[in-house]
Regions:
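Well-ordered alpha-helical scaffold segments within catalytic/enzyme domains
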Residues: 22-31, 75-91, 129-149, 190-205, ...
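Extended polysaccharide-engagement surfaces of secreted carbohydrate-active enzymes
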Residues: 270-274, 278, 284-534
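Low-complexity, Ser/Thr/Pro/Gly-enriched N-terminal "stalk/linker" regions
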Residues: 21-76, 83-102, 106-113, 158, ...
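Eukaryote-skewed repeat-based solenoidal scaffolds used as protein-protein interaction platforms
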Residues: 147-235, 249, 266, 273-280
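Bacterial N-terminal signal peptides
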Residues: 5-14
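Solvent-exposed loop and edge beta-strand segments that line ligand/cofactor-binding
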Residues: 48-75, 111-129, 165-189, 225-255, ...
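Sec/Tat signal peptide C-region and signal peptidase I cleavage site
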Residues: 15-20
């Protein structure tokens, strides 16, 4: 038995300062102006990368300076382009939108889908997100288009709807046919809104009936105690020994919950809307006082960027749609928009706080994805609500335990911390800490002191992640680790971990009994190595 004494920094208040929102007069128009100014900066920068007169296979596409290629989901930028064309009257945005959609023919398939990438991946489940962006562009701004262009875009939308209807293995919450497992839940959640909207546009009640069926099935995919939406991982039919199911905060707040909210409002599904609201409130507990989302524990946190996710859209529109009865949602949007502004350098949104300092270029996926989300929020009518400048994690509440993800949030003085023993795995192992770890430590003045990373960095979704040319890479999660013959053994991967929490005055004690194992739960050559940490 080895005893390792883990020095908790949570109560070491060596830095002064209080956690509170900035004392700034807030109004809906102020928020909209901030968001729109950021949107213009992003979109104008994107246009500097739009290809022109190079080759028919490139013209209209927007080249990513980090990945040296055109991302197949770049068509999502049609919404912000059409919004700015309508808002400003500047033809450059309309022309750019038409040229962009012309380039999208490179990833458009005969079955009505759009591929996620050109000749890199044939995955086409992301058709649902392309369809939502194109639907909203036509719904709000289709009057700007000539008849030929508008009719062509609408025909592609109709074909996309048919594709979603014919591919339950991508979008359904029911096992059918030759399906081996259900797809990640963000696809099912998003198809409800897409099919409901397209059903209305094309007078297709069969689309809307399928949306209703999927939405009804999704009601069974919220956890019992905390109402987390689960399904971001393959093992969904029974919980782990600690009662956990696969949850990813990033995909939930930036795609699934917003699109479910849009669907519930459009279909007037009050039962589902009540569930979604409760889930949104639970997820809001994880927003840090600076507007960041704490996804240090999620199953797909390998795409966590601090302010959100690498290729997910953004939470603003869905939360704004319900802000008339939840004014704290307005404050959450305001703080996140300001964090996005701070994370924008040379007109592009960077995927991490230290990317610029590390010399890592910004992938444009983050920019066009969140430009789409900002636009979705700006398309909505202004809400009338009394501002609430307090978010849940502003309060010095001590500790909150979220049973369904076996995670504790600690709030003492200016410190915020996350301690997790969340043991639901993704389809790829080693994506997040499991064996009892402080996955985030944050201070009001210093910001994040440390934050969890993948246990071992690999390109799980290579087309959607960035490689790193540094010579030495290691996990950023505090841990006990041993390397033997090139294999890493640590507590982060241990699925057989016991955690006990106690409190003494202002001290939060976590006693952990764990083991050193590799990502396949194998022990070192000499056998099991138990570890005790306090």
């Amino acid at each position: 038995m080895r005893n390792v004494f883990f020095v908790a920094l949570l109560y070491v208040l060596s830095l002064s300062g209080q956690v509170r929102a900035e004392n700034i007069v807030f109004s809906d128009s102020d928020l909209r102006n901030e968001a729109e100014n950021l949107l213009v900066e992003w979109v104008d920068t994107l246009l500097t990368y739009q290809c022109a007169e190079l080759n028919p296979a490139l013209d209209g596409g927007i080249l990513c300076p980090a990945c040296a290629r055109i991302h197949g989901r770049i068509g999502d930028a049609v919404l912000p382009l059409m919004y700015l064309a309508d808002k400003t009257g500047n033809d450059k945005y309309l022309i750019a939108a038409k040229r962009l959609m012309a380039w999208m023919e490179n990833v458009h398939r005969p079955d009505g889908s759009w591929m996620n990438d050109v000749h890199v991946s044939d995955w086409s489940g992301t058709t649902v997100f392309a369809a939502i962006a194109l639907y909203e562009a036509l719904h709000y701004h289709g009057h700007l288009l000539d008849d030929s262009t508008r009719n062509h875009w609408k025909q592609q939308l109709l074909e996309a709807g048919e594709f979603m209807m014919k591919n339950p293995q991508m979008y359904s919450r029911r096992m059918q046919g030759k399906m081996k497992r259900l797809n990640n839940v963000n696809y099912s959640a998003s198809v409800t809104y897409a099919l409901q909207a397209l059903g209305g546009m094309f007078n297709r009640p069969d689309f809307q009936e399928e949306a209703r069926i999927v939405a009804s099935d999704l009601k069974n995919f919220f956890t019992e105690n905390d109402c987390f939406l689960y399904g971001e991982g393959p093992k969904i039919w029974s919980p782990t020994k600690n009662g956990c199911l696969p949850v990813d905060l990033g995909y939930n707040i930036e795609e699934s919950l917003p699109n479910l909210a849009y669907y519930a409002l459009m279909a007037d599904n009050q039962e589902l809307l009540a569930i979604v609201e409760r889930s949104m409130n639970t997820h809001l507990e994880f927003m840090l006082p600076d507007g960041a989302w704490d996804n240090s524990w999620g199953t797909r946190s390998f795409k966590w960027t601090y302010w959100g996710g690498r290729t997910s859209d953004g939470f603003m529109g869905g939360y704004y749609a319900l802000a008339d009865r939840h004014p704290e949602y307005l404050e959450a949007i305001r703080r996140n928009v300001r964090l996005l502004r701070k994370s924008t350098v040379d007109g592009l949104l960077h995927a991490g706080r230290d990317y610029r300092a590390s010399g890592i270029p910004a992938c444009i996926h983050h920019t066009f994805g969140h430009a789409k989300a900002l636009t979705a929020f700006l398309e909505l009518p202004s809400v009338k609500a009394t501002p609430n400048k307090t978010l849940p994690r502003d309060a010095e509440y001590g500790v909150k335990f979220f049973r369904d993800i076996r995670t504790w949030l600690v709030a003492e003085g200016p410190w915020r911390a996350t301690f997790t023993g969340y043991d639901a795995e993704y389809k790829v192992k080693g994506t997040h800490p499991m064996g009892g770890a402080v996955s985030l430590l944050w201070h009001a003045q210093a910001g994040p002191v440390f934050a969890a990373t993948m246990n071992q960095y690999t390109l799980i979704e290579a087309p959607n992640m960035q490689s790193n040319s540094r010579k030495y890479l290691m996990s950023g999660t505090p841990r006990v680790e041993m390397v033997q013959y090139g294999t890493i053994y640590s507590n982060l991967d241990d699925l057989d971990t016991d955690i006990t929490y106690t409190k003494e005055k202002d001290t939060h004690n976590f006693h952990v009994n764990t083991h050193l194992v590799d990502i396949d739960q194998q022990t070192p050559i000499q056998g099991s190595i138990p570890v005790s940490m306090d």
